[in-house]
Structure formats: C-alpha cells, structure tokens
Regions:
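Flexible, active-site-adjacent loop/turn segments at secondary-structure boundaries
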Residues: 100, 104, 262, 320, ...
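Glycine-centered flexibility sites
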Residues: 323-326, 429, 500, 511
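Long, charge-rich boundary regions
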Residues: 473, 487-524
Length: 524
C-alpha cells in the first residue's frame, strides 16, 4: 500500500514539475529522452550530509512543537537518535542522508562508559536493524550512509570530545583504542546479516584508507567485505570524495540530471557536431538546476521542509549534479569511432567528453558537479526510447553506466583498473569502481591483499569488492552465485550490487538483469 501511495503521488508531482515548473524545452528534453531529471516524482532535494557532531551536541531539535530530546548521554541512546534523525530527514529528501566521522564521533561514548566489544555490538545492532526498517515514504528503508575515518583525523586529535552535549576532560585523540572496538563491533554485526542470512542494505558504509592501514589485523572488516561487499573504500589522500558516498555536513545535491550521450553520438555527423549537441543539451540541464534551486528555496521558506529548515537557510550551497550514461555505447555508435571503450581511440574521445563537461561546469556561477550517476533505471529507460526511435542504435537493451567498460569486456581486474583510473578521477561528484566477483571469497586475507594491491597501485578514488552471494530460505547464506541450494535443492535468492547497494536479482529491472547475465566477473 505504501508503494501504491508513493506511485500515485509521484505521478502527480512529476506532472507538476513538467507542466507547471519547467519550461517547454526542459520538459521536452526529459520526455523525449535527451536527458533524464532524477527524482522528478518528488518535491525535494536529492541527497545531503548532516552534522553528527551537532546531533551529539544538541540532541533532536524541537520543530513545529514535535517531540524533541536532549543530547544523548550513552551510546545506546545516541544510536536510537541517529535512527530517528535519518528517518526524519529522509522524509524531506529523495536520496541518501549521510553522517561523516561516524566512528570518530561515537568512540568518546565507548571511552566514557568503558564499553566492551559486546556492549558496543549490541548498540550498533540496534542502529543497523533500526535503519533498515521500511519507515520512509513508499514503505522503504531510509537511504542512509556513514563514513568511517578509521583513524582519528588530525583535526580531531587535540579537540575535546563531546558526550551528553558537553566537552569532556579527554580528547578524540585519546580514543584511538576505542576505534578498534567500534570497528570490530560494527563489522561483527554486518557479518551476521539478518536472521535469514541476508546482508543489510543500509547504511552504505564508506571507509577511508590510509598508507598506515593495518591490512592483516582487520579480520572482521575483510570478512564483511568478502561476504557482503561492505564497505566502499575511499582513498582520501587522492581525492576528497563526495556524492552518495557521503557529503560533508550541511552540503549535498539538490538535483541530478543524466545526459543521453548515446543518442548524441548516434545523431552526430562528426566529433565536432557531437560537442555542439553536447553543449546544447548540457545547457538545458544546467538551466533545470537553476529552476529547481529557486523552487526548493521558495518551498523551504514556505515551511515545506521544517526539519531541513532547522539546519539550513537555503539550497544555494547545494550542488546541481550532472551525469552521463552509456559512454561505451556512444563510442560504438559514433560514426567516427564505431569501437567500444576497450579501444584506445574510444578512451581518448571519452576523456575529451569528460574534460569538456568539467571545463563547462567550472565556469558556472551556480555549484554543479560531475557524477557517475548510478542511473540503474535510466540505463534501460534511455535504451528503450532510443530503440523505438532509432532501431539501428547498437545496445543490449540497456546502456552501460557512465564511463564503465562493457561488462563482458574483460575478466582481468587490473586491465580494467588501468583503463578506468583516468576516467574515475574526472568525476568531481561521485564515482566508484566495482570489482565484481561471482564465486565469492572464503579467505578474508585474500580480500585484504586485493584491496591493498588496488589501493597502492591504482589511482581510483573509490572502489568496492562486490561478491555475488546467495540465500536459501531454509539454510541461509551461501557463498557465491548458487541458483540451487546444495543442501535442499530449492531455488535461492541471488544478491549483487546494483548501482550502489545490494538487491535481490529478481528485483532488478529488465535491463540490469540482462547486464548481469552478460557480466564477465573478474578472476581473482
């Protein structure tokens, strides 16, 4: 019923944006498939980062005479407050709500109360289960994300820790020992999965790697990575990564638009013609950001987002986020190329496209970033529209995400990394490199070695280890892709990451299912 209500209200809201807010050029570009305006079924901004430090300092605020609370005195209380806060904010935003410095800001509570790993695990288990309850609109779990510093950051080392809204007589730097307790407890909960052996969708966990990372003494972390593909690995010194991997506090994305560059390439008579068309359609996208920002500011002032209003005064510091879909197919359909992204000429052209867009965005008066948009639905949406209008367009019924290689290109992860690292660093918003593994990995030390190798030898800002796993209703978790349970011979559920988080393969759209069937996983 919640999904039906969301669907019906979404159609009304989409019609409002397209008929009452956007002008004919923007509306037609969206309807015709030249571009796609994300979250058009919602009257909100996209994703946002919030200050966990502020929540610890002030507690939950009183808004419109609703229930408020004092700052948490204990970790168990704080975990409940975080669940409530993220659920509340999700109702005023369309996508990810994130906390940075999750571990750094929680460890003083462990230090103060001298909590054991078991006690911390119980608190975090409550948080994890609470955040996965379908409490947001449409009977969905809040789309939440947390970032782990792993080591206390330099800016926190000499800073007085905060517990119960007050400064303590110790600093965050005094809590490095408790960081290990929190990490072990968190990933112990992740490793258990739910009662049926399924992994937790949320929160999406991102972790900053560093040159001093203790690779061979983080068993719980790499077990979670091998079993459920958690976390995302961020290379902090290489790029200050934002996006759905966690915006900084009081920053985020107010809207996302993805460009159909496959159509642009197919219709263009030459490379020069392509860039003229790209310039024109990106102008339309940028104008849509200006319109949406104005509308959101008006609605914020009118009181439509009361909890958001308690923290920000406008959306002027929030990014418009531009993305592209189908670079591989664009190269295949370009008259001057006719080659996929494994080809050097296609790679050179793709870099020219990314550099063109980055140069254009840097010269904007408004804040706009370039993102490898997840676009799990848009990949199929664009391909279906184009197939009807232009039957000769080459595709497999979907377009490849952003500048990714075709999923059947190679089973050599290091070849793929070598090609992708230049592309990945062009995205100022968010991107990731997924290491797809179909068979699963039983040895956590092998995962640790793989992560270490990628971190030390390839310049990718974000990457994931993405094993496929299976679940039998009766026998629970099964390693790797197993369509039939070896114990009872019943059909299983297959799980893999679809553009950001894990979902049951049966719930993927038609295009993404086709992509999964063609996917050549990496040999590890």
């Amino acid at each position: 019923m919640g999904g039906l209500i969301l669907s019906n209200s979404g159609m009304i809201t989409s019609n409002y944006w397209l008929s009452e807010v956007y002008d004919a050029q923007i509306t037609n570009a969206h309807k015709n498939g030249d571009l796609y305006i994300h979250n058009i079924n919602m009257l909100t901004g996209c994703s946002a980062g919030w200050s966990l430090e502020n929540l610890i300092l002030k507690g939950l605020p009183s808004v419109n005479k609703m229930i408020s609370s004092l700052p948490a005195k204990h970790l168990s209380t704080l975990c409940n407050q975080m669940v409530n806060f993220l659920g509340i904010m999700q109702n005023e935003w369309a996508s990810a709500q994130s906390f940075a410095h999750f571990d750094t800001l929680l460890v003083p509570f462990i230090h103060q109360d001298k909590l054991s790993v078991k006690m911390v695990s119980d608190c975090l288990e409550s948080f994890i289960y609470g955040i996965n309850i379908p409490s947001r609109w449409g009977t969905q779990a809040p789309f939440s994300q947390i970032t782990l510093d792993w080591n206390v950051p330099q800016e926190f080392i000499n800073k007085k820790a905060i517990v119960a809204g007050c400064e303590c007589d110790f600093t965050y730097g005094d809590c490095q020992k408790e960081m290990k307790i929190l990490h072990d407890a968190l990933f112990e909960v992740i490793n258990k999965g739910d009662v049926s052996g399924r992994g937790f969708q949320f929160p999406i966990i991102a972790l900053y790697l560093n040159p001093d990372f203790d690779w061979m003494h983080e068993e719980e972390l790499f077990k979670a990575c091998a079993k459920y593909g958690t976390p995302y690995f961020l290379t902090k010194e290489k790029q200050d990564v934002e996006g759905y991997f966690g915006y900084k506090p009081l920053c985020g994305s107010m809207g996302v638009v993805t460009l159909n560059i496959v159509r642009l390439a197919y219709l263009s008579s030459s490379k020069e013609d392509f860039f003229k068309r790209l310039d024109n359609v990106s102008d339309v996208a940028l104008r849509s950001f200006e319109v949406k920002r104005q509308v959101l500011n008006q609605l914020l002032e009118a009181g439509l987002y009361p909890y958001t209003k308690a923290y920000i005064s406008d959306f002027n510091d929030y990014y418009g986020t531009l993305g592209i879909v189908g670079m591989n197919e664009a190269c295949l359909n370009a008259k001057w190329l006719k080659k996929g992204l494994m080809d050097l000429d296609a790679q050179t052209f793709s870099m020219e496209v990314l550099e063109f867009l980055n140069h254009k965005l840097l010269n904007q008066s408004q804040k706009v970033n370039l993102k490898a948009t997840p676009a799990e639905s848009v990949c199929t949406h664009f391909a279906q529209i184009d197939q009807e209008l232009y039957p000769e367009i080459q595709s497999h019924g979907y377009y490849t995400n952003s500048t990714y290689l075709d999923v059947a290109s190679t089973d050599d992860v290091f070849e793929a990394l070598h090609i992708q690292q230049d592309f990945q660093n062009q995205y100022s918003g968010a991107t990731s490199f997924p290491v797809f593994i179909d068979h699963g990995i039983a040895d956590w030390k092998m995962v640790a070695l793989l992560v270490k190798t990628i971190y030390e030898n390839y310049d990718v800002p974000v990457f994931t280890i993405t094993p496929t796993y299976s679940v039998c209703e009766e026998h629970g978790y099964l390693l790797g892709h197993q369509d039939i349970c070896p114990k009872c011979s019943k059909s299983t559920e297959i799980y893999s990451r679809v553009s950001g988080y894990y979902r049951n393969l049966e719930d993927w759209n038609e295009g993404k299912q086709k992509e999964f069937s063609r996917r050549k996983t990496y040999s590890i």
